[in-house]
Amino acid sequence: MTLYSEHVVVLRTWKLGEADRIISMFGARSGKIRAVAKGVRRTKTKFGARLEPISYVNVQCWKGRELDIVTQAESIELFPGIKGDLERLRKGLAMVEVIEELVAEGGADFEIFRLLVRALKRLEEGDSPYLLSGYLWRLLQVEGMAPQLTECVECGKEGEGLGVFSAAAGGMICAEHGGGVPISAEAVSVIGWMCEGELGRALSLPDSGLRHEVEGLAVSQIEGLLNRKVRALHLGAF
């Protein structure tokens, strides 16, 4: 077996047998990794605590045939501010859940890793009204799943009349096509900033009804792609 070291964010864990856990992680070089942490449920140790979801750690693993084996985990950032605040915890769990469910296994994607780490660090410093939606829209862009915002996805019409957004269709639709929900011009602009990575412009905006519109559309788009609800987003009031 090959021994390797990797900076990872823990996405999710599962019980395995009487004492072990399967750890799903997203690595800077390897992308999604699944590995077994042996004996972590037998006693409360720092090793086990470092392998909880929303932990940024440096792991050492043996490469396995089906599952790798975690032999060591050193903390980089455990995000106590996120884990100690219910609202921030809900958002942090949503960030890792979406990667766990949406991003395919295999192959490195450093841009996704960097996006996740930066979003968690910003959330640790203090919540911003547009942080979660900015993260979700940018993730969709990086994954090649961003919506079409400048023309009708059904017929290609541009300009006036594009006042409806359809998550199912994948973007804006004109009045000639049914379905979708009304969307404001301001929301279209903000979503465009987020998809293109101009999160600073969005994060500086004050909280308002626009935030609910932009976030609600992001969640609809994500949940439509997953064909299920994002569990973490429904732990509390949305």
Task: Walk through the language-model features, giving the residues of each.
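Non-catalytic alpha-helical scaffolds and adjoining flexible linkers that form interface surfaces
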Residues: 1-22, 26-238
